[in-house]
UniProtKB/Swiss-Prot annotation:
The keyword Signal does not apply. It comes from Xanthomonas axonopodis pv. citri (strain 306). Transmembrane segments: none annotated. It comes from the Bacteria. Belongs to the cytidylate kinase family. Type 1 subfamily. One of its GO terms (biological process) is pyrimidine nucleotide metabolic process. This is Cytidylate kinase. Keywords: ATP-binding, Cytoplasm, Kinase, Nucleotide-binding, Transferase.
Length: 227
């Protein structure tokens, strides 16, 4: 039986703030949270552990079906992710994992294999789904849709600050190039390209604090009745 619990989709490019905003909004609403990017990153980690060739789609599709991914939801603090029983949380956020996940996400069979896994997160009292095609492909019937964006420079700056605070040495220009390259891949892929849903509310988060964005998103829900 199909679960018709309400869904809020928050899509956008890498670094727009959707992950942090989605976790906080879900915690405040008391709803479940889906980090769809973590699923693709988890497959990327599994592929890396198995030393698979990223240019071998068949092997990556098999890896997708064989990989068991478990989430330990810590609310606003984020997620602990287990890949085939092993803690992969640290590796999930590496830039190399993100690049691998982006390449894997371009494979139609991988996206198809993960589609139902993502939809299974929809259950009462509601779901906040964070990703790149949540409002267009996974939950096109979602009652609430938001698309967060920001300039590539702004997003690179945020990531640079985040990594430096963690003691990870990184060059801003390298991050900017990686973000721009990923934007191009995500927008140009044949299957589920990155774009806002026609009925999504667009929010440019440039210059905005996280709490400002959270309040705006929560305010959108408060001001609307699910269709």
């Amino acid at each position: 039986m199909t679960d018709l619990s309400p869904v809020l989709t928050i899509d956008g490019p890498s670094g727009a703030g959707k992950g942090t905003v989605s976790r906080i909004v879900a915690a405040r609403l008391g709803w479940h949270y889906l980090d769809s990017g973590a699923l693709y990153r988890a497959v990327g980690v599994a592929a890396s552990w198995a030393d698979l060739d990223v240019s071998d789609p068949a092997a990556l599709v098999r890896c997708t079906f064989d990989t068991k991914v478990e989430f330990d939801d810590a609310g606003e603090a984020g997620l602990r992710v287990l890949v085939n029983g092993a803690d992969a949380t640290g590796e999930l956020r590496l830039e190399t994992t993100g690049a691998l996940a982006s390449a894997i996400a371009a494979i139609p069979e991988v996206r198809s294999a993960l589609k139902e896994r993502q939809r299974a997160f929809r259950r009462a009292p509601g779901l906040v789904a964070d990703g790149r095609d949540m409002g267009t492909v996974i939950f096109p019937d979602a009652a609430y849709k938001v698309f967060l964006t920001a300039s590539a420079e702004e997003r690179a700056g945020r990531r640079h600050k985040q990594l430096m605070e963690k003691g990870v040495p990184v060059i801003f220009d390298d991050l900017l190039r990686e973000i721009m390259a990923r934007d191009a891949r995500d927008a140009q892929r044949v299957v589920a390209p990155l774009r806002p849903a026609e009925d999504a509310v667009l929010i440019d988060t440039s210059g905005m604090g996280i709490e400002d964005v959270v309040q705006r998103v929560v305010g959108l829900l408060a001001g609307r009745t699910p269709s």
